[in-house]
Design a protein with these regions (language model features):
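C-lobe/activation-segment region of protein kinase-like
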Residues: 149-233
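Catalytic-loop of the protein kinase fold
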Residues: 128-139
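Juxta-kinase regulatory segment immediately upstream of eukaryotic protein kinase catalytic domains
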Residues: 8-29
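ATP-binding glycine-rich loop module of kinase domains
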Residues: 27-70, 74-77
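Conserved protein kinase catalytic/activation segment
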Residues: 140-152
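Conserved hydrophobic core/spine positions of the Hanks-type protein kinase catalytic domain
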Residues: 122-125
Length: 233
């Protein structure tokens, strides 16, 4: 992915800019900025990494942005050593540093069938560690890594609980459903009967979300905050 940092987030490349919380002796490129903060590609002589920064968020949204960032921190700590998940490098009150995953979005590099097997292995590891991503409908949260395997980023909305808790099991099932939706988009003929049954059975949470909170969420994020989340079908 080196040389095409904007691909990491599915956004357009932006010119290098200064970052108040980025190393002063390195270089930074702004990859994304929205109502909940900024994401930077940071480089120095020894390494390249990603920094999420929330210090510039409007004061009334800052507590929410900090809470989401700390949720990502907790998730990454639980997922240390899982292939295809960024490593937590450092964090502070208003920033979080994580390792860079070299790869491209699903739109930029349509995944091969083997990629979906790799993605399912990641989801099994997440559930085993007590984490559900909770935002995998978005194509940009999945990566096709340079070796062809799967990668997952952006754990701000993750659900963290004991693996056997009903909520965790429910949300892990929704993660799998969203992966199968992407499989249907790229390899419909490869769907197994069990995959089709799972896609057809939307959980009570998914039904309630679509009928009630999703509408309010879309109004808040798109009309009030001007954030387009790129959620998949």
């Amino acid at each position: 992915m080196r040389g095409r940092p904007a691909s990491f987030l599915g956004g357009r490349r932006m010119a290098p800019q200064s970052c108040a919380t980025a190393p002063s002796d390195g270089s930074t490129v702004l990859l994304k900025r929205d109502a909940f903060g900024a994401v930077w590609l940071c480089r120095d002589d020894a390494r390249t990494w990603i920094r999420r920064e929330v210090g510039s968020v409007r004061w009334w949204l800052r507590p929410l942005a900090r809470a989401a960032m700390q949720r990502e921190r907790r998730a990454l700590l639980r997922l240390r050593g899982v292939d295809g998940v960024p490593r937590l490098l450092a964090n502070g009150c208003d920033h979080l540093d994580r390792s860079l995953l070299e790869g491209a979005t699903l739109a930029e590099r349509p995944p091969e069938l083997e990629w979906f097997r790799s993605a399912r292995r990641i989801l099994r590891q997440l559930r085993h560690r007590g984490v559900a991503h909770n935002d995998l409908a978005k194509e940009q949260n999945w990566l096709v890594l340079d070796d062809g395997g799967a990668g997952v980023v952006d754990f701000q909305l993750a659900v963290i609980a004991r693996p056997r808790r009903p909520l965790l099991r429910l949300m892990a099932r929704e993660d799998l459903r969203h992966l199968l939706k992407h499989k249907r988009a790229f390899h419909r003929a490869a769907l197994r009967p069990v995959d089709r049954r799972l896609l057809a059975r939307r959980s009570w949470f998914a039904r309630a979300w679509r009928q009630t909170w999703k509408r309010a969420y879309n109004v808040m994020t798109r009309r009030v905050l001007g954030v387009r989340d790129g959620e998949g079908t």
